Design a protein with these regions (language model features):
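Domain-level signal for soluble alpha/beta catalytic cores
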Residues: 1-325
């Protein structure tokens, strides 16, 4: 019997009241973004925002609850931009969209920080979210380790220490869009699999490596299958053909995450559409018998207005309950 669970990759839009309040408290300039040493008023505002994001998910009926990552001004680069040995420089485009983040430049050892685990501990969450080691490395600049392989290893060790400090959660989503947008070349693809292993081995939670904005090229996908993880996540909004091909050709894990809700489009899917998309994927890969199917948006949700994000959460929960596998 397949368990069908509704969840998301996290990184939610700030509630409207929080945008206004934090804008007044923080300002509007690059230097006003989160740095890890915020005062009491800003910290309290983010605490209330986190509670609101958790309430959205609980009220919608999601099966896995994230803390929402409301403090992640720099999106997936956040764990580095708040680190004491990282300098933030100019504004860089976030993948191929109209969002921007501060370039994190690593100037010293990536020692344990605890920022993400502290956020997670402050929320009643059942799912953690981290950038995958490869994506975080591609978003950053190294001025300390001096070698791409050593830098990737250091990023993996840094994330593993963070994951090891997490409070107990059911699931950890490692977000790896760069496996699609900037796929690793020969040699690097094997190291990426090992880096993901290093993070996954640090937690007892089920680990989902979630990819989006297309499908992973064949060779990196084959190496990802070697990683000791519970599930791979696929973006069936951006590239259903490429992702079906990978599963048909190389198989996948016993669990799977299906990105069937568009995290960047304000059009809200109906529960019936979501159920049908999950069942369609299952029908394309009859050789696979999944223990668990995570029904999720393909991307983070911060691209959406808050009312649309909330509506998509409700549709996700209802759609997952209507799935018949």
């Amino acid at each position: 019997m397949t368990e069908v669970l509704a969840t998301t990759p996290g990184l939610y839009p700030l509630p409207d009241w929080a945008k206004d309040e934090l804008s007044d408290l923080k300002g509007h300039q690059k230097d006003d973004l989160i740095s890890g040493d915020e005062g009491e008023e800003i910290t309290a505002a983010y605490d209330r925002a986190r509670d609101t994001l958790v309430d959205w998910q609980v009220e919608a009926g999601l099966d896995r609850i994230v803390e929402g990552q409301s403090r992640w001004d720099d999106m997936l680069a956040h764990p580095l931009t708040v680190h004491e040995n990282v300098e933030t420089r100019g504004i860089v485009r976030y993948y191929n969209n109209n969002n921007f983040y501060r370039e994190p430049v690593v100037r010293g050892d990536l020692s344990f920080d605890g920022d993400v685990s502290e956020e997670l501990g402050a929320a009643d969450a059942t799912q953690a979210v981290l950038p995958g080691p490869y994506s975080l490395a591609t978003l950053a600049t190294d001025e300390h380790y001096g070698d791409d392989a050593a830098f990737l290893d250091a990023i993996a060790e840094f994330l593993a220490a963070e994951a090891e400090a997490f409070p107990p959660v059911e699931t950890l989503f490692l977000l790896e869009p760069s496996l699609v947008t900037d796929a690793p070349d020969d040699g690097t693809d094997e190291r990426v699999s090992e880096a993901i292993d290093a993070v996954a081995s640090a937690t007892a939670s089920d680990v989902v490596v979630h990819t989006y904005w297309g499908s992973i090229p064949e060779k990196p996908y084959a190496h990802l299958m070697d990683a000791d993880i519970e599930a791979i996540g696929f973006d069936f909004v951006s590239d259903h053909e490429g992702n079906v091909y990978n599963i048909q050709e190389y198989g996948t894990k016993d669990e799977v995450a299906l990105g069937v809700v568009d995290g960047q489009n304000t059009l809200v899917e109906t529960p019936e559409e979501i159920s049908e998309r999950v069942e369609w994927v299952d029908g394309q890969v009859p050789a696979e018998e999944f223990e668990t199917v995570y029904v999720t948006s393909n991307t983070e949700l911060f691209y959406l207005p808050t009312n649309k994000a909330e509506a998509k959460l409700g549709a996700l929960a209802a759609g997952s309950k209507g799935v018949s596998l």
